[in-house]
Amino acid sequence: MSRDPKLSLSKFLECLNEIEHEFLRDKVEHRPVLVRKLQELQQKTPKHVTNLPNDPETIQQIHQIAHRLEVAVKVFLHIDRKFVSLRSDVVEDTSKALQEVNVASPAVEYRNLSEDLPAYHMRKHFLHTLDSPYPTQEEKETLVRLTNESTARVGQSSVNRPPLEVHQLTLWFINARRRSGWSHILKKFAREDRSRMKHLVRAKLSSSNQSTPPSLTSEKPSDDLDVVLSDNLGRPLTLADKQQFEDDWASMISWIKYGVKEKVGDWVYDLCAASKKTPKPGMPRPVTTVAKRQPARKTKPAAKPKSRTANPRASTTPSIDSTLDSSKLESTPELSMCSTADTSFSTFGSSLSMSHYDPFQYGNDILQSPTFKARGNRKVKALPKRAGKQQPDEIDNGKIPFFCLSIAFV
């Protein structure tokens, strides 16, 4: 554009044509030049517009160029805004697609998980986002849908199981971070800092030759694991610290892959649910307390008092004829009073009438037999011998009856 302080319509038209031509070429290096030319033209035009000749044809051409420039600028601005919007949509859609692929398609190092487990997709997502296992709302909805679809394909074992909901999945991730030991590692080896935990997990995966989770943001490569651990602990790393971290890491990975309850299968849950009694309507729900959880102490049953009733027993006192076989002796409780002191005289009197009984009506045969027939056809044991061996003349003189009666009435 001319530097002449006087501005004519022809020069003004020439300047606009030049600007239009360069603007439509749309070269990046020409943009500052176009801005400078437009600024100069804007400054000169108000000063000379009153002195310009009235040429309708030139003025019409100037209006046409200005209109074309305005339309071109609006189109370029619309294209630029549309490009920015489309780029943002493409990035967002690509991110969602990658997340769904990462959730649905297991990685190579994690394919030892069983797809029959109810929490398969949740565990898979936990392993894939081990550096930050905090799923977004969209990821939660995707995991709920995938879990319910996979559970519905299992069959009869999930007939009575309600579908998974988003709040249940949120609670599962909270419990998983705590029970697996992820929160413990975060507290002990990362100072409860998620950024340090992310750096630590990536360093551990890199040292184990495992693929690190993808990140949309550009981050510097992970440092050595020992360096990261030492920095997080704030002191030199010891062998005990390294071993403790390795043990906690192995325990965490084992829990995430297999868990504790899901190692045995769903049939255990079905069996436990079937064994529970259905509570009656209106009955309060039993609450397990500490006293109920502890098994009752087994106490020794109280010993029964021994009976004081004397058992009938045979007398150990030798009989009159000790040379005879003692196996033929019979013990009767009625007439054992001669050798047992706890049999009352009334019992003896009720069962045997002494007034009608003569023990020596058979002569000396009574002394040769261990038993004799009493009234009522009862066999009665012979009276025990308490004195020395009796002489035949003493038996003939009748001393034995008084001796037996004296013992009977004692």
Curated annotation (Swiss-Prot):
Feature: DNA-binding region: 107-184
PROSITE patterns: HOMEOBOX_2
Cited InterPro entries: HD, Homeodomain-like_sf, KN_HD, Ustilago_mating
Keyword Protease belongs to the record: no
Region (Disordered): 202-224, 278-335, 373-393
Reported function: The B locus has at least 25 alleles, and any combination of two different B alleles yields a multimeric regulatory protein, that activates genes responsible for the pathogenicity and for the sexual development of the fungus within the corn plant.
Record protein name field: Mating-type locus allele B6 protein
